Amino acid sequence: KSNHGSETPGVDFKTMRKDYLERPYQWVIQDIQNAFKHFEVQKIRRKYIDKPGKAEKRPLGIPTIRDRIVQECIKIVLEPILEAQFFEHSYGFRPMRDTAMALARINQVAHTSAKYWIVEGDISKCFDNIDHGILLNRLYHIGIRDRRVLQIIKAMLRAGIMDECTVNEYGPPQGGIISPLLANAYLDIM
């Protein structure tokens, strides 16, 4: 993987290369199958990274490698279902979409419509303010009705931070593989 962050260990200090890629694939498959059968999310390791052009830092939640693999598996199942229902001109955190496509759409509308509105916004602390209950309800109404999948997502959302004695009540953890998809599912109703 070209993403160097993918090698960052979670609270269990396991890495993708040493603890998963160098093991027999049968062991890895068995481990992930067990994770789905008896899913208990581990606490998340907190890491702060610089925000480009700003003095402040952005908190990232680093799940364990096992939890990241489970998140990726769930994302693979959910993404086509959710993508089929998202607004076609929403471009943030979407596969096969980028800012160039958003700008092309703006240019097209500006030259073909007599009247148009452009709304620019930045949802401050978007991930931090997503209500878990509303998100899970939204997923259910979109068609994600498998109880086990919803329970695993709920556990991922509520994963606490190592060294903190609290349960996460709002937002998917920033840094989670599935977090951008869940944020889009939440925001799509707006």
Mark where each language-model region is:
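Non-catalytic beta-strand/loop surface segments
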Residues: 37, 48-51
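Amphipathic alpha-helical blocks
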Residues: 20-41
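Non-catalytic, polymerase-adjacent accessory regions of viral genome-replication enzymes
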Residues: 1-25
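Residues immediately flanking
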Residues: 11, 76, 121-123
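Hydrophobic alpha-helical hairpins/lids featuring a short glycine-rich hinge
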Residues: 51-77, 84
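Short, flexible loop/turn elements at secondary-structure junctions
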Residues: 20, 53, 64-66, 95-97, ...
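Charged boundary/loop elements
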Residues: 1-5, 76-89
